[in-house]
Amino acid sequence: MAGNTIGQLFRVTTFGESHGIALGCIIDGCPPGLSLTEKDMQHDLDRRRPGTSKYTTQRREADEVKILSGVFEGQTTGTSIGLLIENTDQRSKDYSNIQDLFRPGHADYTYHQKYGVRDYRGGGRSSARETAMRVAAGAVAKKYLKQIHGIEVRAYLSQMGAVKIDKVDWEQIEQNAFFCPDADKVDAFDELIRKLKKEGDSIGAKLTVVASNVPVGLGEPVFDRLDADVAHSLMSINAVKGVEIGDGFEVIEQRGSQHRDEMTLDGFKTNHAGGILGGISSGQNIVAHIALKPTSSITVPGETITSKGESAEVITKGRHDPCVGIRAVPIAEAMLAITLMDHLLRHRGQNADVVTTTPKI
Amino acid sequence: MAGNTIGQLFRVTTFGESHGIALGCIIDGCPPGLSLTEKDMQHDLDRRRPGTSKYTTQRREADEVKILSGVFEGQTTGTSIGLLIENTDQRSKDYSNIQDLFRPGHADYTYHQKYGVRDYRGGGRSSARETAMRVAAGAVAKKYLKQIHGIEVRAYLSQMGAVKIDKVDWEQIEQNAFFCPDADKVDAFDELIRKLKKEGDSIGAKLTVVASNVPVGLGEPVFDRLDADVAHSLMSINAVKGVEIGDGFEVIEQRGSQHRDEMTLDGFKTNHAGGILGGISSGQNIVAHIALKPTSSITVPGETITSKGESAEVITKGRHDPCVGIRAVPIAEAMLAITLMDHLLRHRGQNADVVTTTPKI
Amino acid sequence: MAGNTIGQLFRVTTFGESHGIALGCIIDGCPPGLSLTEKDMQHDLDRRRPGTSKYTTQRREADEVKILSGVFEGQTTGTSIGLLIENTDQRSKDYSNIQDLFRPGHADYTYHQKYGVRDYRGGGRSSARETAMRVAAGAVAKKYLKQIHGIEVRAYLSQMGAVKIDKVDWEQIEQNAFFCPDADKVDAFDELIRKLKKEGDSIGAKLTVVASNVPVGLGEPVFDRLDADVAHSLMSINAVKGVEIGDGFEVIEQRGSQHRDEMTLDGFKTNHAGGILGGISSGQNIVAHIALKPTSSITVPGETITSKGESAEVITKGRHDPCVGIRAVPIAEAMLAITLMDHLLRHRGQNADVVTTTPKI
Amino acid sequence: MAGNTIGQLFRVTTFGESHGIALGCIIDGCPPGLSLTEKDMQHDLDRRRPGTSKYTTQRREADEVKILSGVFEGQTTGTSIGLLIENTDQRSKDYSNIQDLFRPGHADYTYHQKYGVRDYRGGGRSSARETAMRVAAGAVAKKYLKQIHGIEVRAYLSQMGAVKIDKVDWEQIEQNAFFCPDADKVDAFDELIRKLKKEGDSIGAKLTVVASNVPVGLGEPVFDRLDADVAHSLMSINAVKGVEIGDGFEVIEQRGSQHRDEMTLDGFKTNHAGGILGGISSGQNIVAHIALKPTSSITVPGETITSKGESAEVITKGRHDPCVGIRAVPIAEAMLAITLMDHLLRHRGQNADVVTTTPKI
């Protein structure tokens, strides 16, 4: 209830600050019998890891995850899985200059007022470094979903600043440092990032997350609709300011005759709904889009105040991404996977007895 | 966990189908000592109620709510509050024609596949009629927030189809049937609705919800951020396909130097963030936008299938809104109020000891 | 979280005061496809109902339960089930004499101090009248457990005051007003009750609850062990002051060589454990005992204080049971059934994939 | 929901197996501003630690806890606290002899059937080694309760086998290896343990846990009564088979005139209720008793079966306590402290507005 847990049956609880000793999480409720090693998580951790490309922060973290429990002889046992990543590059530098400073666009001011104290080193708990554990836990969900149910969860960068992709070639996504599915836009992204670096500024981004081969029936009426829970889990990612399911905000100008996805015996004719009807998966691809704000960690000077009630100017030096949206791709995948996994377990908990002869389309 | 509950400390659990005997809800965790009568809820219920204007469905429901428990001598007692609304206009008409039909854009197919059985009368549990109880519960939250903490939660229609409002005059909202804050757009909305009625079609809408006078500090890191929980509660409203906090999807093209809300001793200079930083309320107005899809209950014929695996044509006759977004205004207010109320109680549960001398801006 | 809900996947939330308009509950998470009518609940409600025998309170309540939602054409639909029982015999008598009085052994003082206000009529929310809804919800669980899984949950009175039963004849339990499985003790119980009535006093009781045909595997390590959750649900019944699983407090003087239930290929040789090992059901009968205190609603004068800070004498007149333990028999069954049902759904949520070739004994 | 979490606002989630790499836990919801170091936990960990006395198992574990997050400059920050204890004495011995063996009285059979796989080394997750993290988390709760609210939680051994204590001298408890408050019984306990060691057998025990200076008002009607949640948390301790609140099972033979705790302006005259009325703390001492079964890890040969469906004989060699109840003293304190802490936060979450002029007695 204090917010560091997500999920009901597949539950992930995390801890750890940006410049603390370690990050960790506990996965509770993972089905037993799943083969699992650190390698299964390391791939996605590496995709999210800082310092892997010139486009992202140069902080060097190995992000090596260790499984501390819940796996025996290479298989999950059904008991709680403890995961740990040690922080190796905290750089115990002097933080006295930002100790009292409320950086605009950051959580400094709100954490300070909420708790009275805060770990000001690198944002403490509010740092996006926390998302490493989401990616680790998400990798477990992704493996289970893929291996046992054939469900695949993938994401890509669909827009950065004014540059939008024009096509989706799944093969391209891992071929460039932007998780960009349109090879023709890679240069434009590259150019934009260079420009921003030079100017010491940052830019927002749009990501698209897709889950394919999802069975019909996941999601609970009326508050825990699948789309509501997906909105929750995606909006919980640092910097996300908007979530769309399917056509999202485009529906405002659509007609009902245009939006409804007509059905034939061969399947749905369209997927404006993004794979969710009445809060329950329809069997079509789950499609979501998220908007990530430009980071406020920039060198353009800004006005702010201190915890002592003084005016101040802020410049955030250090190792920061001009576009935090890029590295959010594996995070978005992780969050969607965790939510689908949770709903899959919840669905069969209640409905394992159901037998229906109606054909699924 | 089965989805009919929202909130942790201020918990709302609902039941009821469109054409069942009654709708009801239990509010658990309401602070004691709040003066409360049915009238406090009836105003918002009437705002949501069908049949109150020519622009909305003509189903006639009194929507008279009864308090069954939890209130004694006009005051909440701190124990669970039972609320009931009897369905009076179910019109026990013949539903055999849609019994086997999966209406496109509706939850018919997904409920059927999930549960094996479904109450097909008027959508059963998936009907927006369910939202009446949200409004009733939300009215309790709104009263507490306003009376004890001075927090106000209001919403309005900001777009319908291609027609957007140009200004927000709070006084106007209750002066027209569209909850439109821009008097100059009322005629355009009216015209659009008439056109749609004639064509038997429907249209999407955009709503804006604003909470003012919210204290700094509400929201929990890292998964139960206030924005994540607001996204969840707003996305759980029928027909919502997108949620934005603050600038929402506009952030994609913003620069960090532009988006970050700089702070001065007189307060924040802007509110691009929508009143939430790091998942915690900043003391600025909470601002959210939602996109509602056009209803699929239209008379334009559409293609679909039946539970027996046959092709079929569907035309939805009956008493339906051409724009379901209009009546969603009080619902959106209710959901935001419930979420804020919950977080207010959660915040003080953990942090009641906190004393900070840092000035709030 | 505010306490009026029990269960995770099979969730029961209740409302209602002793002298309010109605009692109600919402069952969320019931599997779909279960045939269910009011009759299925009425039998247990009648067993718990006041006024049915000369041994229990003479308050006359029909306790007629109405299903308001979640059941369609005689079958559960998987959506939330709303239940309602109207209070018909509130007797709007004058309560001004106890309005300010804190009756010893009751919740008057604690509710008053916790909430600042309380519904003093008949104990309000703290009255055992609240348990009617537990019995109704428990009947749904009992039906599902029996019909789909063959699990049976039954209870009996095993001791009242110093009178203990010597044998358990399941056929006898419904043959007498005490739910006593030992026909030879019925007269002694009858005599004890008569004596207490004459003296205006009350007595404690011990109940035994047994679930048979429970599959191996229900219960979650480490905090939500089946025994821990059973202890929770049984201790939540009014007047319960102790819970034992299996041999309970007798284990203090047992040797390990005596207590451990040895296993053979024909099954366990004994059942000291009460059917739970390591918090997980073993496939043996689940056996629990509970101790219920003597009610404080007696006519023997007692010393107390008022909410105004004055000394006072209290005598509780009215329609009260000399032994509240008797009517608790169906309540205990209901609580055990609700807990087993919840764990059954939770177990299959996580472990539906498990295939083991090891024989179950 | 998968069982490795306890509490709602003060939440403790644990992981770790007996012979795994490490044990850990996450405390979520701890109020900020509490001074906290490893030392605050180490004292209780040492009290629970194996190998500290000749009466308990000789496994040597340093049980050194490390704080990984949530504490900054010696103070809790309000964010999740990560704790870790590395297993140092796993003794990677050969477990092939018990790999297929279901030890009677243990969780081997039930875990195997539930999950299909299990970590058989030393009981894996079902080992009481898991309780180290409960003690660590409990120490945080104990410190907060004591320092901020003056609440003290203490426990002692009240019976082992047939030997019962006759008096409670709080000063004595830490003066002997049995946590025995009656100096005159220490020799009898010592003799009993020696005898059992010689015979290779074990014995049960009874513990008493007391919380003093608890404010009136903690606990939630109707399912999350304080006594119900205490029963849950105490019954979740390994080997516990019974829980009593106040007079517990003695109430069966009590009269109402005897049991009800009469009230005067100077306070309650007695405390039969154990400090809880109607599920809510009364301001008196909270008193609970628990019964712990004799461990089945004994050298007396016993009959059992294997996972292959064969008969077998079992003798448990190794480093085991003849009376596991002794070391459960700090565990029982921890569990009661966690539950009180949770309810204290929950209470003020809902009821922080309450002002009552009625004097507390």
From Swiss-Prot, chains A, B, C, D:
Residues noted as binding FMN in the record, renumbered to the chain: R125, S126, S127, N238, A239, G278, K293, P294, T295, S296, S297, R319
PROSITE patterns per the UniProt record, alphabetical: CHORISMATE_SYNTHASE_1, CHORISMATE_SYNTHASE_2, CHORISMATE_SYNTHASE_3
Family: Belongs to the chorismate synthase family.
Protein name: Chorismate synthase
Catalytic reactions on record: 5-O-(1-carboxyvinyl)-3-phosphoshikimate = chorismate + phosphate
Residues where NADP(+) binds: R48
Keywords assigned by UniProt, alphabetized: Amino-acid biosynthesis, Aromatic amino acid biosynthesis, FAD, Flavoprotein, FMN, Lyase, NADP
